[in-house]
Design a protein with these regions (language model features):
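N-terminal Rossmann-like dinucleotide-binding module
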Residues: 1-46
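Glycine- and other small-residue-rich loops at beta-strand/loop junctions that grip anionic moieties
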Residues: 9, 67, 93, 118-119
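Short, Asp-centered acidic motifs that coordinate Mg2+ and/or phosphate
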Residues: 30, 63-64, 114
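Beta-loop-alpha module in the N-terminal Rossmann-like domain of NAD(P)-dependent dehydrogenases
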Residues: 48-107
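Rossmann-fold dehydrogenase core element
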Residues: 102-120
């Protein structure tokens, strides 16, 4: 069972949460959000823990992260998650700067972790 941390409990985090509930191979185990009530609501729906983004990324009980946070946070989260060895699914856009996107891709390649960008 792939253990997923959902970063961002807004609309898109809720969409990904509903998708995870339909899978037999993955489950949400942790949720973070800037708004505590949003994180708690989504976590409660999944029997998951509310944690900070840094705690989720550092947790040995989390295999992968779904990044559904504002675009300006993606760069730092991707860098940190890759260095921590987490598989990463990131909402688009990865960043608004092509240089920063390249840096993210370099870090992901160096860490040899799975990385996927969402596109509807």
């Amino acid at each position: 069972m792939l253990r997923i941390g959902i970063l961002g409990a807004g609309r898109i985090g809720q969409v990904h949460g509903r998708t995870l509930k339909q899978l037999d191979t993955a489950q949400a185990v942790a949720v973070s959000d800037h708004f505590d009530e949003a994180a708690k609501k989504l976590a409660d729906e999944h029997g998951a823990k509310v944690m900070t983004t840094d705690e989720i990324i550092a947790s040995p009980d989390v295999d992968a992260v779904i990044i559904g946070t504002p675009t300006d946070t993606h760069f730092d989260i991707i860098q940190t998650a890759a260095k921590a060895g987490k598989a990463i699914f990131c909402e688009k856009p990865v960043d608004l700067s092509t240089d920063r996107i390249r840096q993210c891709l370099d870090e992901v390649a160096k860490a040899n972790v799975p990385f996927m960008t969402a596109f509807n």
